[in-house]
Every structure is written in C-alpha cells, then in structure tokens.
Amino acid sequence: MFDISSSNLLISVLVVLFAKQLINAVGKATLENIGWSAYCKVAPKLGDSKFIALDQKNVELAKVSKERKSISAQDQYARWTKLNRQFDKLTGEINKLKEETSASRSYISKYIGYMILVTTTLPIWFFRVWFRKAVLFYFPTGVLPHYLEWFLALPFITTGGVGLTIWMSAVNNVVSSVIFLVKFPFEKEVPFPSKEVGNEKTSINKEEVSGTPAAN
C-alpha cells in the first residue's frame, strides 16, 4: 500500500514543499482576499440573492452618482436634492448588504484554511510518518566522511543513505531561499533616516547627558 518509487517520492516532496513555501510567501491573508473577490463575482451567478441585490444597488448607485454630478445644485436644486437623497439611501442599503454578506467571508477563509491544510500540511506529515524509513538514494562508499554519512542517515535509515527527513529539510531551505531571492527585488525599499531625525536624536541624547535643553 502506498508503494512509491524513490524518484516519485523525491518529486512529490519537492512539489508539496514548493507549494507550502509559495503559500507562505504570498500570505494566507492575500489568498483569503483573492478567494473572497472571486466569490463575490461568482455568487450572483450562483443565485445568491444578497449578492444579486448588492450588484443591482451598486449599478443604481453608479447611475445616480453620474446623474447627480452632471447637474448643477444651484440651477436644478430640487432635482439635485432628490438625487442626493437617493444616493444616501442607496449607500445605506449597500452598507447594510455588505454587512449581511460579510458573514460569508468567514466561511471562505475557513475553506481556504482547509485547502491549505489538505494540500500542504497533511501531505508533509504523511510523508514524514509513512516513508520515514524510505531510502531515497545512497552515496558511494568513501565519498563522504563517516560522521557525515551517519548524520545524513538520521533518524531512521542505515548509514550511507539519505532519508526523507534530511531531504525535506534541505529542499525546504533551498526553496525558501530561492523564493526569497525572487521576491527581494520587488520588496519596498527601506528609506534612509532623514537628517532631521538624526539631529533630533542627537539633541535628545545631549539633553539626557547634560540635563539641559539643547539649543536649536
């Protein structure tokens, strides 16, 4: 049962760990926002009455807002006032519908959490337990020092082989480093401390040492 070749096991572990690190890099909160946005687009097509009403109200609000902006409050005050009341009413109804539909967001977040658990966490633990004694590959005798061969065989296999525990640790570190290198150029730059901030800190330090306010 669950008999799998070493090469397939290597690839399977690599895929699962890559998916895990990619999810960590993107962030669970980002995935939840993407899932919620997708659900908001699909829900009206699935017949969810609240989302259908929310879409209709948003269309009406956009129409009223456009019409209100196209007229002058001074020249057509009565019409502008009427449109303004409609705008306020629609805004209130939309906010109420958003509060009602927000309950669905917790379910979406829960399902996304389950998907992450099923696709990454559970497979990793399954591999660790079920294939803990599997030898993925062997090093030729004498290639590595004996103490290193012994370490790579930890904790369940014979000296000279590489087991799943060491392999998963190595792959996890490599994938994490690669993702970090890919993300790094796109990270926001940390601004240098301004000269004013530096002068302010210097003044504070002088006050602490001398006990008198520093001259500006």
Swiss-Prot record:
Coiled-coil-forming residues are: 54-105
Q: Where in the cell is it found?
A: Endoplasmic reticulum membrane; Golgi apparatus membrane
Entry-linked Pfam families: CHD5
Where are the annotated segments for Disordered? Answer: 193-216
- Principal localization reads endoplasmic reticulum
Q: Which GO biological process entries does UniProt record here?
A: tail-anchored membrane protein insertion into ER membrane; vesicle-mediated transport
Alphabetized InterPro entries for the sequence: Get1 (IPR028945), Get1_fungi (IPR027538), Helix_hairpin_bin_sf (IPR029012)
Q: Which UniProt keywords apply?
A: Coiled coil, Endoplasmic reticulum, ER-Golgi transport, Golgi apparatus, Membrane, Transmembrane, Transmembrane helix, Transport
User: What superkingdom heads the lineage?
Assistant: Eukaryota
This protein's membrane topology, according to the annotation, is: Multi-pass membrane protein
The molecular function GO annotations come to: protein-membrane adaptor activity
Look up the record and report any one GO term of the cellular component aspect: endoplasmic reticulum membrane
The UniProt transmembrane annotation reads 10-29, 117-137, 162-178
Q: Where is the composition biased (Basic and acidic residues)?
A: 197-209
Q: Which residues lie on this side of the membrane: Cytoplasmic?
A: 30-116, 179-216
Task: Provide Lumenal-side residue ranges.
Answer: 1-9, 138-161
Q: How does it assemble?
A: Component of the Golgi to ER traffic (GET) complex, which is composed of GET1, GET2 and GET3. Within the complex, GET1 and GET2 form a heterotetramer which is stabilized by phosphatidylinositol binding and which binds to the GET3 homodimer.
**Role this protein plays:** Required for the post-translational delivery of tail-anchored (TA) proteins to the endoplasmic reticulum. Together with GET2, acts as a membrane receptor for soluble GET3, which recognizes and selectively binds the transmembrane domain of TA proteins in the cytosol. The GET complex cooperates with the HDEL receptor ERD2 to mediate the ATP-dependent retrieval of resident ER proteins that contain a C-terminal H-D-E-L retention signal from the Golgi to the ER.
The family note in this entry says:
Belongs to the WRB/GET1 family.
- Protein name (database record): Golgi to ER traffic protein 1
The record lists the lineage as: Eukaryota, Fungi, Dikarya, Ascomycota, Saccharomycotina
As recorded in Swiss-Prot or TrEMBL, the protein's gene is named GET1
